[in-house]
Amino acid sequence: RTNYFQNVPTNALDLALWMESDRMGHLLGVVDQEKLDEQRGVVQNEKRQGENQPYGKAFTAISESAFPKGHPYSWTTIGSMDDLDAASLEDVQDWFKTYYGPNNAVLALAGDIDLETAKIKVAKYFADIPSGPPLVKPEKWIAKRSEEKREIMFDDVPQARIYKIWNVPERDTEEAAHFDLASSVLVGGKNSPLYKELVYEQQIATSVSSFYYDREIAGMFFIVADVVAGVNPAKVEAAMDDVMTNFIKRGPNPKLLKAENEINKTFEVEEIITSIKKNYSFCWYQ
């Protein structure tokens, strides 16, 4: 998914629609080999910068390890250097024609405009852009595992870091909401189970985090801990497992659960306050 947005006064709406329709309908006319090589270099530098940061190579290894070969999530979005080097002008043109048509886009307008005026203006600027080929929505592929898989990486980092990851259902499911809430309860504050046990009581980790990585055909549930220097990572992992076992067996602390539910409700209300956030939320759920 690529997001484009413009925040303009009403009298500049036509200009914004014209610019976006020009991008969708006529960009290929100015993409030549020189521009492709220039942008390829930009992306490659972005990849190097990311990988040269502490723990920057971890997610590539996680993607390859968590999903089987052939799964769309078994490689990172930015791709490998070999993939970037191999991308041709024809590849770029074919990809653009396939995915950047109006049949694969959602356009939302929010603000001082009525529905009929919006329809007229959008038709004026976008109606002549040809649709791309019909697209088949990918089927969900959670890549369930029947065994534990372990990987050890060595890199120039300030301290050891433990990633525990589970392949779980995709976004916009009941399970996704549960995992999102669970991550907040597990690490949401100094009284949360993982933080309290690892950082405060045992003092074997300097930080601990958890999050649900929501994607279209599969999700991932992460728990991450940074190990205190000199502490055996196995001790930290064992403590993480104990907390998770108790959490699964007994469920969340009712007070923590109530507090996190209230925080999530507030966040959801804040998400629809501004026009941009309204547009984003609308497009996301289309």
Question: What would you call each of these model-derived segments?
Answer:
Residues R1-M24, Y55-D82, N104-A110, Q159-E170, ...:
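M16 family metallopeptidases and their MPP-like homologs
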Residues L27-L28, K69, P102, V106-E170, ...:
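An aromatic/glycine/proline-enriched structural segment found at the starts
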Residues L28-V31, K35-L36, A87:
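Peptidyl-prolyl cis-trans isomerase
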Residues R48, Q53, E64, P134-N191, ...:
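His/Glu-based metal-binding/catalytic segments typifying zinc-dependent metallopeptidases
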Residues F96:
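Conserved, carboxylate-rich catalytic/transport cores that coordinate ions
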Residues L115-K119, E174, N232-A234:
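Extracytoplasmic/secreted cell-surface and envelope-processing proteins
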